[in-house]
Amino acid sequence: MGQRKAHFGTMLRQRRLAKGYSLRKFAELVDVSPTYLSLVETGKAEYPPSAERVRVMAELLGEDPDQWTALAGRMPEDVKGIILNEPEAMPALLRAARGMSADQLRELTKQIERKNQEGKEP
């Protein structure tokens, strides 16, 4: 987890500076203290920001919220809810998909989306 925290913090700092945000201004926009934000950026925070705060950070920086949430070691709240609503089926699906390539996962996602659309058609 230490390397993940450091990598997330490094990426966050690089993107924040590239977008021209000061540490104080960005902390204010994300609703955290500048001290905590500094600890996150240096990989020294005891815990990563919440999934919701990471989503806000990503959106402010023009980054993909899901990718950034994963980079921070968090899980999007909606995904957590989906898993909790289907406590047997969802873990089984994820285990079955383990080891698939990114291309295979994208294709599987498309198949599931098509299946969902079929279920909505009259």
What do the predicted segments below correspond to?
Residues 12, 23, 34, 51-54:
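Helix-turn-helix DNA-binding elements, focusing on the entry/boundary residues of the two helices
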Residues 41, 49, 72:
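DNA major-groove recognition helix of helix-turn-helix
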Residues 62-78:
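Short C-terminal boundary/hinge segments that cap the last helix of small helical domains
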Residues 51-67:
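DNA major-groove recognition helix of helix-turn-helix/homeodomain DNA-binding modules
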Residues 1-18, 105-106:
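A short, Lys/Arg-rich alpha-helix, primarily the initiator
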Residues 73-122:
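Interfacial/linker helices and their anchor residues that mediate assembly or domain coupling
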Residues 16, 27, 58:
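The alpha-helix within a helix-turn-helix
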Residues 20-40, 68-70:
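Short alpha-helical DNA-recognition segment
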